[in-house]
Amino acid sequence: MQFDAGKMNWLGSIAPAVETMAVWHTSPVRSIDDVRSREVVAGASARGAISFTYPAVMNELLGTKFKIVTGYQGGNEINIAMERGEVQSRNNTWSSWKATKPHWLKEQKLFVIAQAGPRARDLAAPSIEDLTKSPEDRQLMELAVSGTQFGRPFATNAAPADRVATLRAAFDATMKDPEFLAEAQQLGFEVDPVPGVKMQATVEKVLATPKTVAARAKALLE
């Protein structure tokens, strides 16, 4: 499904996505510095996919040495590949790790060495944005992680401004509704809302990305 993000009216997101890079326990790697000094095999689905984007961007901007192997049909296949020893690391959201592999975290079979996007309060791993130094590199990093704000988004197509304002207010009220929050907790959904106005500003910033930065990102991911 294709759509023009700039023409959408973004109402809000239930929670942003905190992206991570994690390594399997059999690897000696426990930090970003470790991946700067030794090669680590990272599993991914395809070039341009999120699972490819994060290790590729870290290689480009942070000097890591992820060897990215593509061809896996989704995250579950990459998880199995880690268990088999085919790969040693992968990208995934923090909420997904906690929901699908809590025993891996508890038993220290998996170590998160980096996070991206809004900082997770219950995760000590460093932020890759904070480690990016030059202004040019920061522009590329900001573009790469811009999607983390969207998480579980709500949006509508062309609509009058007053209707958009009403929908955004309704979304904001829902995010504070005790009944909704209780049900979300029961279902294990994290609620850390991102306002629609903030999402709209992010889209506008991405669309205004300098051509040189966009070209660099395209070359990196293709």
Language model features with spans:
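Conserved hydrophobic/amphipathic secondary-structure segments
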Residues: 1-151, 215-218
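Ligand-binding clefts/hinges and TM-proximal coupling segments of bilobed small-molecule sensing domains
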Residues: 139-160, 179-193
